[in-house]
């Protein structure tokens, strides 16, 4: 898989997508990096720590978040994307579900569109992705948590995302799938989809797992958002074992090391 001119061996490796929220209200790090210098300094640290992709978000998607206008989101993300592209040789992802924001971000240099609605919120976003031939990550999401059979319905929802992508002309080798931990699911469903992550391999697309500091970890360990790193690392290790090609995380260094150790244990050993 090629993203931003870089080759990703999604069959054998697990890559780290570092989170860069330039928002005042994201659940974990809102307000910490919404100034240009703070954002760039954090990006430098993530690249130094081994981030394979930087994911830029201009609107919080936490529960109860306040929606902002396309123009406001564009004003937040495009300057940082332009600066990141000038300074780093690392692919840049834009975390948005809005076609106008995606268009502006790709024109600013974004190499991947990370859509938390899997092309279902804004029908024009698929056309933007196809037109520019950039990669996309399609996340599972729903307005409610009512399922007839959770795993069956989940898989059908993912197939619908794929159908939308293909109908717009997005190439197979540009698609990544995300199970959407923390979105449109109960606590037990979130645990279940992490545990059964390997079922997504039947869809034959690379998997991105995003669990970093999420409520499923907080509820399990009864910990606030700033104390969920160990829980995140466990889900990263589990995800690697289940076939994740990417993990989206806040702490790049720790997750990179956890992946490296897990891969060493999983490979064939010459004894």
Each PLM stretch: what is its role?
Residues 180:
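Conserved Motif II region of HX4D acyltransferases
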Residues 1-24, 166-170, 263-271:
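N-terminal amphipathic alpha-helix/helix-capping segment at the start of soluble metabolic enzymes
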Residues 47-48, 161-174:
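Phosphate/pyrophosphate-binding loops at sites that engage ATP/ADP/AMP, CoA/4′-phosphopantetheine
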Residues 20, 50, 113:
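Conserved hydrophobic/aromatic pocket- or pore-lining residues that grip, position, or stack substrates
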Residues 3, 28-37, 41-42, 61-83, ...:
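Active-site-adjacent loop and "lid" segments of alpha/beta metabolic enzymes
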Residues 41-57:
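Catalytic domains of carbohydrate-active enzymes, especially glycoside hydrolases
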């Amino acid at each position: 898989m090629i993203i931003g001119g870089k080759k990703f061996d999604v069959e054998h490796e697990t890559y780290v997508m570092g989170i860069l929220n330039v928002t005042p209200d994201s659940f974990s790090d809102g307000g910490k990096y919404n100034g240009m210098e703070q954002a760039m300094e954090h990006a430098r640290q993530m690249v130094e720590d081994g981030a394979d992709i930087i994911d830029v978000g201009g609107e919080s998607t936490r529960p109860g978040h306040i929606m902002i206008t396309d123009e406001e989101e564009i004003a937040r993300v495009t300057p940082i994307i332009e600066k990141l592209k000038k300074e780093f040789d690392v692919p840049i992802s834009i975390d948005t579900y809005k076609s106008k924001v995606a268009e502006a971000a790709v024109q600013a240099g974004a190499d991947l569109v990370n859509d938390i609605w899997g092309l279902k919120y804004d029908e024009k976003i698929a056309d933007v992705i196809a037109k520019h031939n950039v990669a996309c990550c399609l996340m599972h999401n729903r307005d409610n948590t009512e399922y007839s059979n959770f795993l069956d319905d989940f898989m059908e929802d993912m197939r619908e995302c794929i159908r939308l992508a293909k109908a717009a002309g997005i190439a197979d080798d540009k698609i990544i799938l995300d199970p959407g931990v923390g979105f449109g699911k109960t606590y037990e469903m979130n645990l279940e989809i992490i545990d059964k992550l390997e079922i997504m391999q039947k869809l034959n697309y690379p998997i991105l797992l995003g669990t970093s500091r999420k409520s499923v970890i907080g509820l399990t360990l009864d910990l606030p958002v700033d104390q969920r790193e160990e829980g995140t690392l466990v889900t990263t290790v589990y995800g690697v074992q289940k076939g994740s090609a990417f993990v989206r995380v806040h702490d790049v260094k720790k997750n990179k090391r956890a992946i490296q150790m897990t891969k060493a244990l999983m490979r064939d050993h010459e004894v």
